[in-house]
A protein has these predicted regions:
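Short beta-strand/loop segment at the start of cytosolic alpha/beta domains
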Residues: 1-17
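Conserved beta-strand core positions
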Residues: 3, 14, 45, 75-78, ...
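Short leucine-rich amphipathic alpha-helices used at interfaces
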Residues: 4-5, 44, 113-114
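General small-molecule cofactor/ligand-binding pocket signal
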Residues: 6, 80, 102
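Conserved catalytic submotifs in the C-terminal HATPase_c
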Residues: 10-11, 50, 106
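Active-site donor-binding loop signature of nucleotide-sugar glycosyltransferases
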Residues: 18-20, 104
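Amphipathic alpha-helical interaction surfaces in cytosolic regulatory modules
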Residues: 21-99
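A charged, well-structured terminal subsegment
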Residues: 103-122
Length: 122
């Protein structure tokens, strides 16, 4: 399957659908898409990885690099739809502890809503 990324928006959250294989060949394109979102002020991101078939070390590095960029901009990156192979890679590398995972997009979107509605402490 060819690599592709598409972006949708729901309120102040960008939903990024990633399909195919995320390897060294595709990681630059993925990075540019996330950086464009950040440059345009979209700092809350949900990665829908339902269609991601494979992830190599370059793809893992790109996920981490993009996550760090989002956090530095004051945003959050969450994931949904981990295929078993991708989930196993994230567990083996301990990255499942870094990326908040949700069972579906609705749950991930609700988690952003909960953050927006949380009381501000003085």
């Amino acid at each position: 399957m060819n690599f592709s990324v598409s972006v949708r928006h729901s309120e102040d959250v960008s939903l990024v659908d990633v399909t195919g294989r995320l390897t060294s060949f595709e990681s630059r394109a993925f990075h540019q898409i996330i950086q464009t979102l950040l440059r345009d002020g979209h700092t809350n991101i949900v990665l829908n990885l339902t269609g991601l078939d494979y992830l190599d070390s370059s793809g893992i590095g790109e996920l981490v690099r993009n996550y760090m960029s989002v956090v530095k901009k004051g945003g959050a990156m969450k994931v949904v739809g981990l295929a078993p192979k991708v989930e196993e890679i994230l567990k083996v590398t301990q990255l499942y502890q870094v990326f908040p995972e949700f069972p579906d997009e609705a749950s991930a979107l609700e988690s952003f809503s909960a953050l927006r509605n949380a009381p501000v402490r003085a």
